[in-house]
Amino acid sequence: MGAPRDIATRAPAPARTATGRRIIEITIGALVVAVAAQVTVPVPFTPVPMTLQPLAVLVVGGLLGAAGGLAALTTYLALGLLGLPVFAGGSSGVVHVIGPTGGYLLAFPVAAAVTGALAGRSAGVLRTLLACALAMAVIHAGGVAQLALLGGNPAAAFRMGFVPFFTGDLLKVGLATALILGLRSRVRGAN
């Protein structure tokens, strides 16, 4: 019977290389979102800051595909929950997942998967734009839902969690679409 390392070396070299490349892509995707989270702008009358996270979530999902985007954003959440300062403004911990911004954070993996599933390698401009818009809607649905749950007032949650971000997020959807279309041929993990 061979040593355990013999089992690992039996996989064909291209499979090992592809798996390693995929792990690197997922890790880079998580780090891109972590860096984007550090760009924060406080918004009056809401506990939710404006960040570049949603833009990064859409781009990571669009470039890595549904499974890769889901894995990258799940990794991102795990890093933050483990105490690494990857959430907005260098924060971390479970308090951010159960607090006012938690709904957005928990929606990120789903949004990345939606973008990746709909904005595949052959998707044109319109399909990619719609994928990004739908994914942004997923992010806002999660965020507003958690704000409503915590505050008990759905109308106030909508005013605090969606209205101040609408215009900026339209721009992020357009920019994400352009970045996905411009970069996806360079990323092998795109579906």
Task: Give, region by region, the residue ranges found by the protein language model.
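Short helix-perturbing small/polar motifs within transmembrane alpha-helices
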Residues: 2-15, 35, 94-139, 147
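Hydrophobic transmembrane alpha-helices
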Residues: 2-70
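Generic alpha-helical transmembrane segments of integral inner-membrane proteins
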Residues: 27, 31, 35, 59, ...
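Short helix-capping/hinge motifs at transmembrane helix termini and TM-loop junctions
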Residues: 37-44, 83, 88-91, 119, ...
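Structural signal for the C-terminal ends of transmembrane alpha-helices
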Residues: 63-67, 114-122, 182-187
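Membrane-embedded alpha-helical hairpins and interfacial helices in multi-pass inner-membrane proteins
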Residues: 122-191
